[in-house]
């Protein structure tokens, strides 16, 4: 199961948050954004329970994250 | 700009080593069947790459207890469905690229080389680049910007000059280039295009991604096993294919190659001891692939990705082959024409680099879609230029488009002339990607 999480961050924390997100093994992609959100992370897990565990035990503890928005990927199309 | 110089040199060395292949094998064709050469090169290389992969896993596990690589998982993942290649299992994907990509493209390359000359065969490499460009345009993956058009024009001019000079050389040597040689060259370009398009359509399973995140060197044994399986399965499939050709009611050049191949199987170990075969195995297969995989794993985030540099530097192979064929084996190619072709091909490299650097606007577009139209809309949007991937989501938004375009003009066109004309899109949010961090 794949999910994307978009983050809104506080001021001057982007580098620190990105480093902490990169250190989580289940997160396979991290990118900085310009727009409503500051960072996007893509996570790969086995179950929704695992997603909850990683979110509550690792991601939610990162200082500097103001808000997050999670979407589960149902299907992917590629050229 | 920060260059990954250390690993760029890996790509350059690999291409230089490949460029010696036609020079090394050209004289071998009169003594040994093309099929025997291919069989030995890929079968032995496959075994060696496999052994290296397993050894690397053991060495890693011995030195690095915390970041162990599981051999069992490495093999179990072969059953994983490749979502980027028609959802077939990984091992079937490896068989396909092994036989139709690697083995057949080298087979047609050698046949063309046997029937024509080394410079003439370089046309095949240049045609492959043009075919891939048209394929990418056809599927709306890339657009023909000014750089791309110019590099196709440069390649076309180079092809014309090489053809003209090769025909002249054939006339002087009284050894005409046969039509069959050109047909083999076209077949080489087609199979080679298939190889380049499909070889990167590999997908990682969930467990593999986790393993890569824990230990990035997991990718090396995985890639080596992929190539080993592709090589070995390719040459194994070559045997029934050869038998089939041998029993065809009509005789062709390929039939003679097949008969010679079966006759030579008795002397296989003697042939294996020849320096040309050893060069092909060690210096044209094992070392280049190791260099490439090492570069790929250690690639640092820079302006361009590994794949982009790989396609830019791929032109080193035909350039150096052309130079070495003139300098080492005295192929006919007047100096002034050689300089012109080299200049054209170097300009092509620069144009290709410019195209890749310019092609740099990345964005994620989030869409809310009207109920009941998700699937049809996704397939429709995927056809638009710039849309590389689409994820269907559960959450606030229904779709996320992964977009990469050449310019803001193209981006504006996608948003305002394409997406905003779709009634089923209720809301649209753009997020530009600043930097890919992982």
Where is each model-derived feature located?
Chain A
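A compositional/biophysical signature of low hydrophobicity enriched in polar/charged and small residues
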Residues: 1-79
């Amino acid at each position: 199961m794949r999910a994307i999480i978009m983050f809104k961050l506080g001021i001057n924390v982007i580098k620190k948050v990105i480093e902490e997100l990169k250190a989580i093994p289940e997160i396979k992609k991290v990118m900085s954004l310009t727009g409503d959100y500051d960072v996007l992370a893509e996570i790969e897990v086995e179950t929704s329970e695992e997603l909850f565990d990683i979110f509550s035990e690792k991601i939610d503890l990162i200082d500097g994250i103001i808000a997050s928005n999670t979407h589960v990927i149902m299907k992917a199309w590629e050229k | 700009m920060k260059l990954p110089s250390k690993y760029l040199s890996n790509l350059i060395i690999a291409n230089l080593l490949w460029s010696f292949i036609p020079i090394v094998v050209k004289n071998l064709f009169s003594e040994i069947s093309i099929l025997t050469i291919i069989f030995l090169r890929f079968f032995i290389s496959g075994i060696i790459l496999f052994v290296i992969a397993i050894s690397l896993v053991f060495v890693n596990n011995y030195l690095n207890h915390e970041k162990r690589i599981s051999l069992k998982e490495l093999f179990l993942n072969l059953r994983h469905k490749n979502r980027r290649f028609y959802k077939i299992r990984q091992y079937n994907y490896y068989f396909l690229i092994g036989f139709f990509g690697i083995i057949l493209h080298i087979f047609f390359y050698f046949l063309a080389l046997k029937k024509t000359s080394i410079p003439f065969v370089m046309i095949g490499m240049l045609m492959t680049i043009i075919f891939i460009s048209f394929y990418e345009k056809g599927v709306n993956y890339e657009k023909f910007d000014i750089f791309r058009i110019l590099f196709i024009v440069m390649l076309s001019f180079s092809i014309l000059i090489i053809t003209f000079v090769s025909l002249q050389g054939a006339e002087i040597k009284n050894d005409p280039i046969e039509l069959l040689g050109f047909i083999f060259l076209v077949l080489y370009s087609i199979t080679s295009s298939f190889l380049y398009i499909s070889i990167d359509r590999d997908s990682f399973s969930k467990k593999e991604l986790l393993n890569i995140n824990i230990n990035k060197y997991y990718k090396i044994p995985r890639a080596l096993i992929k190539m080993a399986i592709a090589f070995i399965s390719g040459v194994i499939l070559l045997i029934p294919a050869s038998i089939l050709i041998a029993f065809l009611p009509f005789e062709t050049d390929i039939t003679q190659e097949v008969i010679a191949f079966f006759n030579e199987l008795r002397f296989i170990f003697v042939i294996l001891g020849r320096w040309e075969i050893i060069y092909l195995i060690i210096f044209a297969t094992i070392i280049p692939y190791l260099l490439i995989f090492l570069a790929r794993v250690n690639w640092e985030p820079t302006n361009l990705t590994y794949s982009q540099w790989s396609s830019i530097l791929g032109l080193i192979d035909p350039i150096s082959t052309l130079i070495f064929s003139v300098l080492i084996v005295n192929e006919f190619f007047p100096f002034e024409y050689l300089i012109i072709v080299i200049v054209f091909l170097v300009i092509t490299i620069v144009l290709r680099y410019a195209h890749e650097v310019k092609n740099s606007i990345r964005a994620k577009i989030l869409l809310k879609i009207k109920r009941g139209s998700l699937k049809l809309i996704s397939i429709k949007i995927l056809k638009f230029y710039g849309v590389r991937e689409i994820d269907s989501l559960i959450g606030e938004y229904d779709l996320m488009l992964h977009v990469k375009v050449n310019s803001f003009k193209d981006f504006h066109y996608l948003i305002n002339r394409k997406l905003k004309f779709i009634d089923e899109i209720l809301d649209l949010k753009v997020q530009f990607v600043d930097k890919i961090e992982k």
